[in-house]
């Protein structure tokens, strides 16, 4: 009987803007020990993907790791995989940007490892059919996707242990299916169980089995370091696989070797897809709850079976619908990418845009970094760098444009020093306020939303006892909350206006969801009005903003106050009439991560109020001078020290 070709692939990535200590800990605890043990046991050949942000950090901080990889590549023991260099979701990029991102990775691999790569690790396995043409144009011969992508199209599992070919616009790329069962077995189950499955595949006459998954599974996920290293799983696994090789049952293979040795299954057209959990995470909260109930009714056995692929969630791009914060960053990236192309694509701006295309801060699940302020900050920092380069020397201007692609116009105000977006359909709130010198979008405060897991966490799924270690998705189901967290009735922004009762602060009237008529009366002057309020913005070239409100005081009694809420990611200088009241609170979210539920400070809410009987209010905001003793560094609006990024993100105590 012919040996089964076994492909062992590891993908290793850290996002743009992640903490230095996270890079360091993963290199020390995961990347180095894994590679050293693979080399010690000669468990080769394998395939490997290193993302651009991780490559850059390793080059500066752990070049010996890259030297080891380079030696193994040179000896034919490692086949390197491409991706978009800064680990973008390729489907979410303009087509030219996709090809350029892959081109950067081509250059990096050839420069550092001396080889031309031809296979692609598809970030988060987010596939769209048109990608085939762009991958082919970028010099990609083959791409790895989940076997589920095929199952959704009606393929049988038994058909997936061979390469397939797909096409778009007359261009072709080969597709290899990653075996989902292997992903769930490795490294969570004993080596003997994995060997049994591999033998089962060979006995069925299959020629190829592909495992490719996160390298962080081998010591970076909760509980895995003890299991993989201290309890000896990795040594047991390598020893077991060595015996399978020695007995002629399997042969280790690269993807390229497999393409040459295993005949193609033919033509396959795959639908838009990602992995099962990702599609569930992208659903709105209510829909995700319904999907969970449906899966429970069908039972784990049926979901894991052939029909389970037809029970699925939403498109990855639905995160842009679910989270406006993600959408704004994405649409800002698209706008700047187009502007950069129009202006000759200066290298500094293009690289900053490329870094801002890193995927992690765009989505949220048990993985995903949308809830992590430092990852969103890194995206906005790079967008600020790009826009500063592109707008050098520009004077103040305002554009009326559907900035967020929601069918409603916004006003984009910008100069050589700042960029801001006013949303008339949100009562004239400012939804972006980026100061280029600071590299900060001060409006980047995540809204507190009800997530599906907030509802179900009071009824966790019990973990079955086993002789393995639970996967991250099993741990996800067992997390619990003792109480539901607070959530916001509207999206957070700058200048969200309402009338409140002075007695108990309850809202009498809110303009958060009111669409106001608007007019741009000058380069930096905007008027929004309607439904009993008139709101004037005056933007200065240096980025300061003066806001004036007018309303009919006769519409409200003497016990009412006009209030505007300003949600800030970092402190700003706020000048208001001394008679204005002022209250502050931290904006904290409670979200699920691979470590459990975590409480994260997203920013600060500052509410200023005036008696409604006045009929008028005004204030001015501006960034603190970096050269001032009361500057942005080291203080908050209420005078308290600015917390470090580590202090902003902390786990909840066990429940």
Where are these regions (language model features)?
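Acidic-aromatic substrate-binding/catalytic surfaces of carbohydrate-active enzymes
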Residues: 24-28, 96, 100-103, 416-522
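Acidic, His- and aromatic-enriched active-site or binding-groove loops in soluble protein domains
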Residues: 65-82, 103, 115, 136-174, ...
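CE4/NodB-like, metal-dependent polysaccharide N-deacetylase domain
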Residues: 97-124, 199-211, 550
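Catalytic domains of cell-wall/extracellular-matrix polysaccharide-remodeling enzymes
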Residues: 103-158, 217-237
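Acidic (Asp/Glu-rich), glycine- and aromatic
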Residues: 425-427, 432-438, 447-449, 531, ...
